[in-house]
Amino acid sequence: MKRVISVLLVALLGLTTRGSAAVNGDVSGDGNVNVSDVTTEINQILSGSTDGQFDVNGDGKVDVSDVTTVINIILGVYEDPNLKLTGADISLLDRYEEHGALYYDKTGAQVTDMLAFYKQIGLNAMRVRLFVDPANASTTAKGEGVFQDLAYVAKAGKRIKDAGHKFILDFHYSDSWADPGKQTVPKRWSSLTPEVMADSVYAYTKESLQALIAAGATPDYVQVGNEITYGMLWPTGNVYPDGANNKGTWANFSAYFNAGAKAVREVLPAAKVICHIEMANNSNPGKFFGIGAKNFNLDYDIMGLSYYPAYHATASTVITALETVIKQLKVQVPDKPIMIMETGYSYRWEMGGTKDTNISSKYPYTEAGQAQFVADLVTMLNQYECVKGLFWWCAEQNEYGLDWNTNRVLDNWWQASLVDNQNGKILQGCYELANFK
């Protein structure tokens, strides 16, 4: 063991260390994680220490694996297994800032860098969607925010990484919105057979990831598809119900999904693959999807959910509807952590398509009502160790400061932003989000 430890130390001494004020790995107690911590850890191992303070990786032992963990922390490649991600889908942020949207914090001070602000209040991860050829999207879809091509995502992703956030990449595998109601094949793939489609998914995913890495926008987590409760790349990848709709099959869908996952594994072996489904008013989505995913060996690390109370709950089940699904997934896919990849609740007006119009009796459509929803949601989620992520969808949407007639970003307001469109104020719900930990 002494020889193994010596080799590790010699290798590390040849590197430029990167100190940080992180507690995890700072076994020497000097406020940094560097070579002195490796030396301290080695000395503790050689002395036969069983002090839990030096059990850096939390496996109940003090041994050479803890030295490796300290080294990985210094190199920046260690992923804390207990890390929880808190953030938002901010796919519109760069466009809003380019157009001159004005943001203000709760003190009234102008925020000129929203990514730095998010980091300051305690958020640590941001998601951006990627379309194949968004130029092919309809005028309506473009007015809803469909424009994120690879060049845009590369720029946004680099900003996210440079700001110190984890970067979640959301592949839509479509030229426009992909969700439980539509998973339209990109125009460039419209005539492909299932076999060639899978090959195309693999090649496109691999090329996109390589381009992002080259741009300094390396994703930490990758969604292979968006809200794929009923499959992807329809009709051949449609699996509702059980593959009977439009002659889609689980075999096709799993081939498409696993082709994307394979590209992620090859290009970014340290990245986590997220399988993102949506509750779709289904009282037990995991039973349908989880069983199929297991039977067809979908290759993923994390189960992602979308949860919008306006569409998935009633006034009496705003919090419990999601909690019920979390409990079900703990049984159906016990080995998979869960992340809430999308959620949202209005701060002023009822969202179109609201399932229960009495829902505002529980959480009024006000800044305080929205904030209380976030607080109650976070309180519930914090009770479940299996829940490792929480993301607000379109948190950055803000037309304040723009000329609506000539310079707007969206044609319609998203009612559940975490910014008030009328004055640019960042709402209390944004601050509440940071309490998920």
Task: Give the residues covered by each predicted segment.
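Bacterial N-terminal signal peptides
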Residues: 6-16
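Alpha-helical segments with a strong preference for the paired helices of cellulosomal dockerin domains
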Residues: 27-50, 59-79
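Boundary/entry segment of secreted carbohydrate-active catalytic domains
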Residues: 80-117
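Hydrophobic faces of well-ordered beta-strands that scaffold small-molecule active sites
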Residues: 85-90, 126-128, 167-171, 220-224, ...
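Acidic-and-aromatic substrate-binding clefts and catalytic sites of carbohydrate-active enzymes
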Residues: 96-97, 101-109, 133-151, 229-232, ...
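Substrate-binding cleft and catalytic face of glycoside hydrolase catalytic domains
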Residues: 117-272, 278
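Aromatic- and acid-rich polysaccharide-binding/catalytic face
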Residues: 220, 226, 275-279, 286-320, ...
